[in-house]
Amino acid sequence: MKQPVELPEINENGYYEIRLESIGGLGANLCGKLLGELGALYLGLNSASFSSYGSEKRGSPVKAYIRWCGEDREVRVNSPVTNPHILGLFHEAMAGKLPVTAGFTETSKVVINSDASPKEIRQRLKLHGGWVYCVDALKIAMESKSRINMVMLGAIVKAAGFIPLEPVEMLVKDTLGKKYPDLLEKNLEGVRRGYEEVRHEAFKPDGKFEEVPYKEPENEWGYENAPIGGVNIRFGSTVSNDLSPSREGYIPLFIQDKCINCGLCDSTCPDMVFQFKPGTYRGKEAMVNCGLDYHHCKGCLRCVDVCCLLYTSRCV
């Protein structure tokens, strides 16, 4: 059942736009799809949503874009959202490493997964002005046994200010409820708590920080200006990537005294976080497992599942 709404503001092209910035594994892609369906099927709007990401795995950058407009207008733009009315940040650790706030203006609203206050977040993100909405989505997701994207969905709907909670609950029931009926109530609790527990504060431009214009990401070196004969051996590599933001509240805890050095954990780890060095095991020379490099561990817990003696355990 539709509950038609009127968009409070639109840009020069007639659209209300949302951009989600996330890391693979936190559910921004699904959240973007749900927001697209919400506008088209439940709010009486024309809607478009699409995502942009590289390798389809946890830890890689993900962007999702949503456009809404009235039923009297068609969505004819499919380019990235450059100046969002709402910006959703699924992890605060992304700030500073990626230009996630590019295109954010003094009239925009940012919804961020963080336990910090809006004032602290404004300082960390170096925002020129605008509205800051903070919700501890990780904590709520762990307590409700839901997912971060469900909590963020509720918080984004609350930040919009013109969307009732009822059509959002109906959307979750009609989509996720049919696919995962056992998790329906947990997901609904996550949406409700995100809607109710988000905190916000408005900041006027005070000259502390400059507005960051949007521009497409590009490498400093390309085929036109790269040194002749030069080779960038780290191009496209994750050697410097901090994957800790993609965790969802748990990390594997390595118990070295009980490890039998079978190497199954190293075989299943997608990011090769286990470190080995020459040593002795049971009186013989062997490559000994020294544990994890948590800088590259994204908390997928595959090592916990594959450990033959279950000597790698979950740790909150």
Where are these regions (language model features)?
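Residue-level detector of anion-binding/catalytic polar loops
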Residues: 45-46, 131, 265, 275, ...
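Flexible loop/turn segments at secondary-structure boundaries
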Residues: 27, 56-57, 261, 276, ...
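Short amphipathic alpha-helical segments
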Residues: 16, 250-252, 288
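Active-site cofactor/cluster-binding pocket
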Residues: 1-230, 234-239, 257
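Conserved small/polar residues in nucleotide/adenosyl-binding loops
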Residues: 311-316
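Ferredoxin-type iron-sulfur electron-transfer modules in oxidoreductases and energy-metabolism complexes
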Residues: 151, 170-174, 241-242, 247-248, ...
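Cysteine-centered iron-sulfur cluster-binding motifs in ferredoxin-type domains/subunits
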Residues: 253-272, 291-309
